[in-house]
Amino acid sequence: MLSPKRTKYRKHHRGRMKGKATRGNKIVFGDFALQALEPAWITSRQIEAGRRAMTRYARRGGKLWIRIFPDKPVTMRPAESRMGSGKGSPEYWVAVVKPGKILYEMKGVSEIIARAAMRIASYKMPIKTNFLVKSTSPN
């Protein structure tokens, strides 16, 4: 699973997901991409599940880039604990994804294989996604 090696602070504010992605919304590395259409927190487990599904379907063909990284810690309190006594301990890591953000990119495979692989990966995501081809994506 992906997680930062070290961070400046152990715990983060939850924050808000306003607006659309202004960065990471264009295809840079590959020829095909999976783009988010909704705002969400995507956990490191979900990112890894999508990656595994795509690499298994492509059978070591082509190259895959993961364009998101889970750098936000999500804290949780123990079950049935009373209010107060501070914030819970970090349990897992999430990537904050806004609409328009590219999640994965692929290269070196046919469009049919890339489309099918990304459809399988999209089922692992908690959001609606869109398949993009480099030639048709807006600059």
Curated annotation (Swiss-Prot):
Q: Name one GO biological process term.
A: mitochondrial translation
An example of a GO molecular function for this protein is: rRNA binding
One Pfam family linked to the record: Ribosomal_L16
Q: Please tell me whether the keyword Aminoacyl-tRNA synthetase is annotated for this protein.
A: no
Q: Please give the chief subcellular localization of this protein.
A: plastid
Give the UniProt family note.
Answer: Belongs to the universal ribosomal protein uL16 family.
- This protein's source sits in the domain of life called Eukaryota
Q: What is this protein called?
A: Large ribosomal subunit protein uL16c
Show the segment(s) annotated as Disordered: 1-20
Q: What gene name does this entry carry?
A: rpl16
Q: Any idea where this protein resides?
A: Plastid, Chloroplast
PANTHER family, alphabetized: 50S/60S RIBOSOMAL PROTEIN L16, LARGE RIBOSOMAL SUBUNIT PROTEIN UL16M
What is the originating organism of this protein?
A: Pleurastrum terricola
